[in-house]
């Protein structure tokens, strides 16, 4: 995971990363009802909540990258490029498309399906209801804009990995991103045989080269001014609340990019006796045993867990 040199005057985001896993992970054996009760009590009694959300949160909310949602909506792409390669939207994003017309033929549809077309989903709106009267901040690796749609204050969200709604210079020749909603709509209407017309292929307004999605996948990811400002606000929030009672509410964060949310959250709990961790995860709800009562690991259906916690918090 590559984070670039920090611009002068901005917080060094790398200070908040952590690559050290716990050595004492356990699956808690507490009854589900007891875990929900404890989680709700911790949230009710805390000064502030820091939400850390990974891909599992949006999967639980209903944004499925595979299965019927993929095969129904991307049938022409599966037929054209082969089911061996087109197994789901994640794999399709890494396919070596033979042309810019083909690349944007895919990505315009992907962005519309996962960023622009879905409304605010219940898991996210219920999560907002839980924290809206608290001091809160959201740290997320998701790029689907669900937190914004659900009503969270955009000044309290740091989306570290980009945005499906933005594009950038493929070689990052300048530190700026561009809103692509209208362009993607045009591409979607004009697409034929998985390809968009050549006249719709975006070109960098500075160097004239190809454009790319604003997603962190290599060293060319553009961290624009808004990205750095969000990082600064997150750093400020941590500093302002370091001596308060804080709940770290982690949702759907696995071991794909754990250095951004999972390991840093554990580090904060180790270093701050007034911090506690609530970890919701379908299959990886392990928590450090040494955290004792300051950690709750809730496995299974995250959407149900959020609903149940909300029922006890409000």
Label for each model-derived stretch:
Residues 1-314:
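Conserved catalytic alpha/beta core of Sir2/sirtuin-type deacylases, generalized to analogous enzyme cores
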